[in-house]
């Protein structure tokens, strides 16, 4: 045996792909095939198959080799101390949070908590987040996170317009807001026809009515202003007031809710979440209770379960895009749950007193810094400040250069104005180094300690000083030792079913392995400590990796260019449609505003089209779930003068490779439109088909699905877009970092130049380790696994849609509608009963009501697939018992599911099935049982009696 025959023990492909080669052979045999290629010939239309070599993807490397390669690459980065601010600050992540949440697969592999009975832990952490946000900002209700500060501000603008009664289409933005936030607001405003007036709000004369006004608090210069009188003036004119805040500052400052704000937005990053070159971080939006039904994003509320016990759930879901489609309050589908939970745990760990102490220390250091700069005869900005000092100087360039020489970054406002924003990691020694930089390398001649001793206490005027208590709830005042914190984190995580327990077979979600090797680099300081607006020369290694990821994604998809800026799939849709819109405008065809969307589309599609002011025209689907090509052709021709785009998911939302995709694209192109492909199902294409070649002009790719970024319990996500050569010049840019996009591109859709940059290494690592052949095999095994499940279940449940050869793509839909007619058992009952078997339910009632969509992914072993199949077959037998009258139609194991340990231990058991049948319906559960901690949650009760923050979270554990 030669060395070439001895592959490294950490070769990644067999670690990622669940079924062994012998398993694959057996599964193929079940389907009547001898090889994966033979199966592929019957599943994937020949006209879209590719023989491309994927040279830029490469041949794959080992896990150990990957870590060494990436470490060499990012070692080119320069990790300086960052005092740039602008909503991004260095922070100290408590190690108990880093190790037990950020780096813990129980927290990062969970899905969005749509199944509340097996999600109570992260729902509680999110309720803590909402409470923290509402309390600190003096508001009544907050959502469970948004994508970033800029996106949150843009959502607030849209919400303000919806709430305003004066029918205005203009709004005022203070020029003292962070510039990147202004840019994102402007991006959102322009296609909607809103006029953004950037000027001093105090000087606006109201000659033109406005629906809102935006303030930064403290502002981008670091100054704390009293906005109460100005806010009242705008409210008197019918406008809504929005403030963008700094959470740490809110522990000391009068909260916006007390000076008239209707909405408050911001970024929770400095509560223990690393900088990460711009993200991911949890944005937030808080408002008044009266406005809750127009809030964007997810909202956790308190309800009760079937036993009358308090339980948490996602509330008011009728606002969301998956239900309201183009009439939704937002197109957002992904939040930032993992990062919101880190921030909320940071608040739990420090408590209100601890947070205030951190804030007071930052404030004191800022006062010391300011006093020292004045002693150096520098012109320091006037006004009350919290953490930022500005200096006017004619030596700005020399000072910036000196600071960089001393491995520090200051903010350069331009015009000889510099800024320094301090943070919780700043020390007295750091302050002295900052003085030396402003003194062009010479020591100040006095110490920070001496300045501190001579400086009076820092006080703010009474009107700017917080007097109200915050975070008084018990949860924020109980877990301050590491022992207590560790136990609280584990107490919560034990309530949640994640990929650490079992397969999560959610259709259209691709819950594949999030490999440890892919995730390890995210914590490296060469990545986590980079400020998004630091000089790009300091991030040369990470930017090299980003460009290589773009190159690999282009190679995989066949597109000419890729933008990694969109920080969610919904934002990829939005950015892609803006690119199409700008392309039409560049050709003098800006009037094109019709967007064709199949009736089966995911709700984000019409919601995104509405955000770019396109008119949605629905295209019919046939009985097999395929786009009705005749209807498409008729509508494309009917609207040919105004046709902007078609949005189509491929493979289809029904989990089938539609044979007519090339013809569909041609019809749109022949009528002047562009084709937007929703890439939600790209896990069935990689290595086999290249959408940029077979017809679509633009597509987003969900890196949190196909390319292994974890779902985080409902975020983060990344939704980059790939485009054809004719659209490349219109990809998103960023006004503060020109290198991030083309000069003629659309303006920024996210706050940071490369979006959620710190998690991009996850997808880069996945692609690099898998290589072209590994990616191809992953795709084929994902298709094989879906067809294996469909084949095994078709004798028990109808499989709703198949391709022309009787096969599905990477997911299958089982139909429960007839079962409901014969037994009264519905799709919800099946979903809840699966929890008793230790499984998360497949996707319920999408894309067809009364069905379950199953996507196993390539990462699940045959043993796990068989376990799921056995569970579904056993459930079908339980349904049969109801159908035959052997089991009661209402009092049965499905209607009463899930069963908790508390239910089991009650002395009375008034059910016609045994306790054993309830919780051990199959033998293998006896050795490894996941126990839901609440019974079936009452959704209607939760919406009727909405509580979205907690007087004491422990009250709901009783």
From Swiss-Prot:
Catalytic activities: N(6)-[(R)-lipoyl]-L-lysyl-[glycine-cleavage complex H protein] + glycine + H(+) = N(6)-[(R)-S(8)-aminomethyldihydrolipoyl]-L-lysyl-[glycine-cleavage complex H protein] + CO2
Record EC number: 1.4.4.2
Q: Which enzyme type, at the first EC level?
A: oxidoreductase
SUPFAM superfamilies assigned? PLP-dependent transferases
List the GO molecular function terms: glycine binding; glycine dehydrogenase (decarboxylating) activity; pyridoxal phosphate binding
Source domain of life is Bacteria
The answer on whether this UniProt entry bears the keyword Oxidoreductase reads yes
Which Pfam families does UniProt cross-reference here?
GcvP2_C, GDC-P
CDD domains hit by this protein: GDC-P
Q: Which GO terms of type biological process are on file?
A: glycine decarboxylation via glycine cleavage system
What keywords were assigned to this record? Oxidoreductase, Pyridoxal phosphate
The cofactors required by this protein are: pyridoxal 5'-phosphate
Residue numbers bearing the N6-(pyridoxal phosphate)lysine modification: 705
Per the record, its GO cellular-component terms are:
cytosol; glycine cleavage complex
Gene3D superfamilies recorded for this chain?
Aspartate Aminotransferase, domain 1, Type I PLP-dependent aspartate aminotransferase-like (Major domain)
Q: Does the entry feature the keyword Acetylation, yes or no?
A: no
What this chain does, per the entry, is described as: The glycine cleavage system catalyzes the degradation of glycine. The P protein binds the alpha-amino group of glycine through its pyridoxal phosphate cofactor; CO(2) is released and the remaining methylamine moiety is then transferred to the lipoamide cofactor of the H protein.
Task: Tell me the subunit arrangement.
Answer: The glycine cleavage system is composed of four proteins: P, T, L and H.
What family does the database annotate?
Belongs to the GcvP family.
Q: Per its UniProt record, what PANTHER family does this chain match?
A: GLYCINE DEHYDROGENASE (DECARBOXYLATING), MITOCHONDRIAL, GLYCINE DEHYDROGENASE, DECARBOXYLATING
What protein name is recorded for this chain? Glycine dehydrogenase (decarboxylating)
Specify the species: Bdellovibrio bacteriovorus (strain ATCC 15356 / DSM 50701 / NCIMB 9529 / HD100)
What's the name of its gene? gcvP
């Amino acid at each position: 045996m030669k060395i070439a025959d001895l592959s490294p023990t950490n070769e990644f492909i067999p670690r990622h792909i669940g079924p062994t080669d012998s398993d694959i052979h057996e599964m193929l045999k079940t389907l009547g095939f001898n090889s994966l290629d033979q199966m592929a010939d019957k599943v994937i239309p020949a006209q879209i198959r590719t023989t491309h070599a994927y040279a830029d993807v490469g041949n794959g490397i080992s896990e150990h080799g990957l870590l060494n390669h990436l470490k060499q690459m990012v070692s080119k980065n320069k990790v300086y101390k960052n005092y740039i601010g602008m909503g991004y600050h260095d922070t100290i992540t408590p190690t108990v949070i880093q190790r037990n949440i950020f780096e813990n697969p129980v927290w990062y592999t969970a899905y969005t908590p749509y199944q509340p009975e097996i999600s109570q832990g992260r729902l509680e952490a999110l309720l803590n987040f909402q409470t923290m946000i509402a309390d600190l900002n003096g508001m009544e209700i907050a959502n469970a996170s948004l994508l970033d500060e800029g996106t949150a501000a843009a959502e607030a603008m849209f919400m303000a317009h919806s709430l305003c009664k004066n029918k205005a289409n203009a709004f005022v933005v203070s020029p003292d807001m962070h510039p990147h936030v202004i840019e994102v607001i402007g991006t959102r405003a322009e296609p909607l026809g809103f006029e953004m007036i950037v000027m001093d709000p105090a000087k606006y004369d109201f000659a033109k009515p406005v629906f809102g006004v935006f303030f930064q608090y403290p502002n981008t210069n670091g100054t704390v202003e009293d906005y109460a009188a100005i806010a009242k003036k705008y409210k008197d004119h019918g406008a809504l007031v929005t403030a963008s805040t700094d959470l740490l500052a809110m522990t000391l400052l009068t909260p916006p809710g007390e000076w008239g704000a209707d909405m408050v937005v911001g970024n929770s990053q400095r509560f223990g979440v690393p900088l990460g070159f711009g993200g991911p971080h949890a944005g937030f939006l808080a408002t008044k209770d009266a406005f809750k039904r127009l809030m964007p994003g997810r909202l956790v509320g308190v309800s009760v379960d079937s036993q009358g016990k308090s339980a948490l759930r996602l509330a008011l879901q009728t606002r969301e895009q998956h239900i309201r489609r183009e009439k939704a309050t937002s197109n957002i589908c992904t939040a930032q749950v993992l990062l919101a939970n880190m921030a909320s745990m940071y608040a739990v760990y420090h408590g209100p007193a601890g947070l205030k102490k951190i804030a007071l220390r930052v404030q004191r250091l800022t006062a010391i810094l300011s006093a020292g700069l004045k002693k150096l005869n520098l012109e320091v900005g006037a006004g009350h400040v919290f953490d930022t000092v500005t200096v006017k100087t004619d030596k700005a360039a020399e000072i910036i250069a000196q600071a960089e020489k001393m491995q520090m970054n200051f903010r350069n406002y331009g015009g000889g104005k510099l800024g320094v924003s301090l943070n919780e990691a700043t020390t007295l020694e750091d302050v002295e180094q900052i003085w030396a930089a402003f003194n062009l390398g010479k020591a100040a001649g006095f110490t920070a300690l001496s300045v501190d001793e001579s400086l009076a206490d820092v006080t703010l005027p009474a009107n700017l000083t917080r007097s109200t208590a915050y975070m008084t709830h018990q949860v924020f005042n109980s877990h301050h030792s590491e022992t207590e914190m560790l136990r609280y984190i584990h107490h919560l995580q034990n309530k949640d079913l994640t990929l650490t327990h079992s397969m999560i077979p959610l259709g259209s979600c691709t819950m594949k392995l999030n490999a440890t090797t892919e995730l390890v680099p995210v914590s490296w300081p060469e990545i986590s400590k980079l400020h998004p607006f630091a000089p790009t020369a300091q991030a040369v290694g990470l930017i090299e990796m980003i460009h290589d990821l773009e190159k690999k994604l282009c190679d995989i998809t066949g597109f000419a260019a890729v933008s990694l800026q969109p920080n969610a799939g919904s934002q990829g849709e939005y950015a892609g449609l803006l690119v199409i819109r700008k392309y039409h405008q560049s050709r003098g065809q800006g009037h094109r505003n019709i967007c064709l969307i199949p009736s089966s589309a995911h709700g984000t599609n019409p919601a995104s089209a509405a955000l770019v002011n396109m008119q949605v025209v629905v295209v019919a689907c046939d009985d097999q779930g395929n786009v009705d090509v005749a209807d498409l052709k008729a509508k494309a021709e009917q609207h040919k003068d105004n046709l902007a785009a078609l949005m189509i998911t491929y493979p289809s939302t029904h989990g089938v490779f539609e044979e007519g995709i090339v013809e569909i694209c041609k019809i749109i192109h022949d009528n002047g439109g562009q084709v937007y492909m929703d890439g939600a199902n790209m896990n069935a294409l990689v290595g086999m088909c290249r959408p940029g070649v077979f017809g679509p002009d633009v597509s987003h790719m969900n890196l949190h699905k196909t390319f292994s970024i974890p779902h985080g319990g409902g975020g983060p996500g990344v939704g980059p877009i790939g485009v054809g050569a004719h659209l490349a010049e219109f990809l998103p840019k960023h006004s503060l970092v020109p290198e991030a996009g083309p000069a003629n591109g659309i303006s920024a859709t996210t706050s940071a130049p490369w979006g959620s940059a710190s998690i991009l290494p996850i997808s880069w690592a996945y692609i690099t380790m898998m290589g072209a052949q590994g990616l191809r095999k992953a795709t084929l095994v994902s298709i094989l696994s879906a067809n294996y499940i469909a084949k095994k279940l078709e004798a028990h449940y109808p499989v709703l849609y198949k391709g022309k050869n009787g096969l599905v793509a990477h997911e299958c839909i089982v139909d429960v509608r007839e079962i409901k007619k014969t037994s009264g058992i519905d799709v919800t009952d099946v979903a809840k009963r699966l929890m008793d078997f230790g499984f998360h339910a497949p996707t319920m009632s999408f894309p067809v009501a009364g069905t379950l969509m199953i996507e196993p992914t390539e990462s699940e072993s045959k043993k796990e697939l068989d376990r799921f199949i056995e569970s579904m077959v056993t459930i079908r037998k339980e349904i049969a018992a109801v159908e035959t009258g052997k089991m009661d139609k209402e009092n049965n194991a499905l209607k009463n599911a899930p069963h908790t340990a508390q239910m089991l231990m009650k002395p009375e058991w008034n059910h016609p099935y045994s306790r054993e049948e309830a919780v051990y319906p199959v033998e293998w559960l006896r050795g490894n049982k996941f126990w839901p901690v609440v019974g079936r949650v009452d959704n209607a009760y939760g919406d009727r009696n909405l509580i979205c923050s907690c007087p004491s979270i422990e009250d709901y554990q009783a």
